[in-house]
Structures are given as structure tokens and as C-alpha cells.
Amino acid sequence: MINESLHKSINKNIKKVRIHSSGDFFSGKYLRCWLAVARLNPQLKFYCYSKSLNLFGSNVSIPNNFYLTASVGGKYDALIHKGYFKRYAIVVNSVIEAETLGILHRNKPYNIDHDDSSCFKDDAFALLLHGVQPKGSKASQDLQKIRSLKNG
């Protein structure tokens, strides 16, 4: 069903498919469906961000055209810290925070990804705070600063 939907909604110029612009894998069965779709479509690059890292155990075979970026900030962050995921993303509030946390975590600054290109490299990276944040929160204020710098 996922494969049918995919083929109905893409054209031949599409080379990359992002799985979930928001949301995550909710079960091993659902993850295996996406892995099967990737195997059926070797001409496409499938990529995703996930905090459901427990689903990507040693018994899961990931095809070469499937790019997982582990997202820091979830229940299974210990798997990232133990080195099971070379490619991971951390959300930061500023360029300075990306530099500081990168040096603290891995002795070099995190590069900030602006276009999802880092999802195809085997290295950790940062994403600037994005999306919707609780009204009046520090994150909301930081997001307003980020947006004003982009527009300014």
C-alpha cells in the first residue's frame, strides 16, 4: 500500500523521498514496510529522522538507499552516545550553541544543516530550532530570533 501510494504521487524527476516530515516509526512492522519499499525502489534515496532508535536493532537489515538520521532528544539517546548511529542530528537554538555543543560532545563544532543534505553523510550535524514551539517559552523566543536573523 505504501509503495502504491508512493508511485501515484511521484514523478520520474523525484530522486529523494523523505519519510515523515513530522512523526516517526511507531512499530517494527511499520519500519519493515518502509524498508521493503526502499528495496523495491533502488533508484530512489529514502531518508528519515527518528527517535524510535530501539526499532533499528541488529536484526534489521537496512538497504543502501535508506538513510536514517538518529534524532537527539528522545528516550533512546543512549544508543547514539554508545556509537550505534554515526549520523545523528541535534536541534540547537543558535550557531553558537552548535559550536559549543559540538566541541563538548565530539571535539569539533556541529555543522548546521539547512537543506537536508547532511542526511546523506556519515557525520553528526545540527539543525536550528524549527517548527511550532509553546507560546511564551524560551524556545519560542529563540525561534523568533532565528526567523528574524533569516529575514533581516
Map each language-model feature to its residues:
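Class I S-adenosyl-L-methionine
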Residues: 1-152
